[in-house]
């Protein structure tokens, strides 16, 4: 007689084993219809699974995060059902859930086309309308093998081989189609109505380019059609903001096949880049950092000593010269330790903060490259703080404050902070981990802001703090990091003279605020849709004459503004003023200055914003003051 305890503390007794669905039905017909699965003693199970002993139970519905994930996973199985009906010779591989959706990898004799994707989606809708039950059968291993052998599902058989200890497996039947999964899955296709297939791509078996190529069908699924519509609208907005598209429109950069994953910065984009670099240079100088520069190409010996060669060699670009092996640096930290090691260091020299706008190169797979967001050549606002263990908390607290201030300057105020703690495989004593985690946690607490733990997600040598920004579309971008590291100083023999004249290893804090400049600029482009705040805009003001008679004054204004440190250009083309205004509005120039006869006579400029606001005529000095205020606000709102 199982006694079922519900989340509100109420209990229900049964005189026999009972399924999750039966418990839901005993509560009410509405809940029974909405039941996707259950959580029994904290473990997710199918709605059809039986509960034989006393247990706690949470009914999972589409409103729950777990329910939504189950819907997405079941939609992947539905893709399999539709594909096997339309393309019987296709072989199904895997269909996992991903962020906001799912995909299914499929082996087929030819690449799928957009027309194929439309046909698969149409068949999925037809199958959903049949309103059939999804049937789960726990099946002995030998029978599972027989099922997939009979169906010619070679990849499923390989997956079974990967699980030698599993003697029974869950098979989920969508009518004649069967798939293997740990589950749980929806009990009926009625839960799958709010879905859409989104794109096709190639993939490789087990993610290895040496293996056979597969087709990957991506999709998204939601609890209801309202949520689906909101998601589609968000995706459409994201497509409009695609940094690759805007980068071309605003003449910021380009990429080309001859240099995969390397950015060709155009004048406009390089201006944005330089503004970022000069801003970060000033921030670091004001906060006690020394800027250094280290070599691009370093002997293999250093990478072996640092441990990167054994763990990271396949991602490094290498070369040989005069019987020596070299690597283009994928990161700056070993080189910064070399700078620290030059000359004897005392405890009085600590903390020592070394910063570099370090150009790094990593041999990322070509399929992983994405515009300027994921590249092979990039520059980081990289710095390393060498300090005593007692100084860690203050250095971390100062870094947290600095990082949040920088993000505000770029217009980001929704920041999530997470502390990743010791993983199962780690080096160092428990006492050292305790002290390191406590120091970082105390520093986070000093910020007065919310943060959360990520248990087990730290590096094998130390805990770390991660900063994740949420942009205007609600997307999360992990940018800043502070990594506690006693390991690299040990490997590279860094030390300082302590107060008692003993040699002691410093703690090394790896830190970055923006991360990769390339990726951060891509984020800014999409966050602002190219409508940069005045301080970041490649051109801050354009001066336009109505007729040739005003050309000389327009050039005077341009010279005056540029002489004051602004970025201004004049447009003296023999075009209608309305045409010029429209063109520069589309180019997202913050301020449009129009000069006619009256402005020449009064030595003023007629000021418009790219949003269409008419600010009226004013002396150039007054406009310069207005622009100064806009630039000084950076990305902050006037109220901040």
Swiss-Prot record:
InterPro entries per UniProt: aa-tRNA-synt_IIb, aa-tRNA-synth_II, aa-tRNA-synth_II/BPL/LPL, Anticodon-bd, Anticodon-bd_dom_sf, Beta-grasp_dom_sf, TGS, TGS-like
GO molecular function, one term: metal ion binding
Enzyme class: ligase
Oligomer status and interactors: Homodimer.
One GO BP annotation of this record: threonyl-tRNA aminoacylation
PROSITE patterns hit by this protein: AA_TRNA_LIGASE_II (PS50862), TGS (PS51880)
Record function comment: Catalyzes the attachment of threonine to tRNA(Thr) in a two-step reaction: L-threonine is first activated by ATP to form Thr-AMP and then transferred to the acceptor end of tRNA(Thr). Also edits incorrectly charged L-seryl-tRNA(Thr).
Annotated protein name in UniProt: Threonine--tRNA ligase
Residues annotated as domain TGS: 1-61
Cofactor: Zn(2+)
NCBIfam families listed in its UniProt record: thrS
E.C. code: 6.1.1.3
Main location: cytoplasm
Residues holding Zn(2+): 333, 384, 510
Domain of life: Bacteria
Catalytic activity: tRNA(Thr) + L-threonine + ATP = L-threonyl-tRNA(Thr) + AMP + diphosphate + H(+)
Location of region: Catalytic: 242-533
A GO term from the CC aspect: cytosol
Alphabetic keyword roster: Aminoacyl-tRNA synthetase, ATP-binding, Cytoplasm, Ligase, Metal-binding, Nucleotide-binding, Protein biosynthesis, RNA-binding, tRNA-binding, Zinc
Pfam families: HGTP_anticodon, TGS, tRNA-synt_2b, tRNA_SAD
Note describing how the cofactor binds: Binds 1 zinc ion per subunit.
